[in-house]
Amino acid sequence: MTKMNVESFNLDHTKVVAPFVRLAGTMEGLNGDVIKKYDIRFKQPNKEHMEMPGLHSLEHLMAENIRNHTDKVVDLSPMGCQTGFYVSFINHDDYEDVLNIIEKTLNDVLEATEVPACNEVQCGWAASHSLEGAKEIAQAFLDKRNQWSDIFGEGK
């Protein structure tokens, strides 16, 4: 397989076992700042996916709430394949802490009573949301917390 510019295109999606959180990239800026991008994979690639209303609400909830647990988040974005999200941190390289931040954020999702910015002024497709769908996705991921570090299903 020819090496491609996009990191995830070089990942053999048939070898990973979701759910997991993996370091997907590191970039150093000219002034020494380091950005680490993580792949938060909720669903098994090419086998299952998140339905868009739940995924969309999960995106809003995670993007808003993760910033309550750290000031190091640069961005949190859904994958187009609907199997996960990317989250990027600046000058933060503690993987276990990243897992804890994600866990706290998903617990916030379970406690939510509404989806933030779920209106036509603040959202580009406000009609496509499901708080219950987001909670179901979050709970399923949290239920397998002990597997998050085992990217290839090796029991590590």
Swiss-Prot record:
Cofactors that this protein relies on: Fe cation
A biological process from GO: quorum sensing
Keywords of this entry: Autoinducer synthesis, Iron, Lyase, Metal-binding, Quorum sensing
Substrates-to-products reaction catalysed: S-(5-deoxy-D-ribos-5-yl)-L-homocysteine = (S)-4,5-dihydroxypentane-2,3-dione + L-homocysteine
UniProt xrefs under SUPFAM superfamilies: LuxS/MPP-like metallohydrolase
Cofactor binding comment, as recorded: Binds 1 Fe cation per subunit.
The protein's Enzyme Commission number: 4.4.1.21
InterPro entries membership: LuxS_sf (IPR037005), Metalloenz_LuxS/M16 (IPR011249), S-ribosylhomocysteinase (IPR003815)
Molecular functions per Gene Ontology: iron ion binding; S-ribosylhomocysteine lyase activity
Residue positions binding Fe cation: 56, 60, 123
Enzyme class name: lyase
Domain of life (superkingdom): Bacteria
PANTHER family documented for this protein: S-RIBOSYLHOMOCYSTEINE LYASE
Subunit field text: Homodimer.
HAMAP family in the cross-refs: LuxS
Function: Involved in the synthesis of autoinducer 2 (AI-2) which is secreted by bacteria and is used to communicate both the cell density and the metabolic potential of the environment. The regulation of gene expression in response to changes in cell density is called quorum sensing. Catalyzes the transformation of S-ribosylhomocysteine (RHC) to homocysteine (HC) and 4,5-dihydroxy-2,3-pentadione (DPD).
UniProt cross-references to NCBIfam families, sorted A to Z: PRK02260.1-4
Family per record: Belongs to the LuxS family.
This protein's name: S-ribosylhomocysteine lyase
Organism per entry: Staphylococcus haemolyticus (strain JCSC1435)
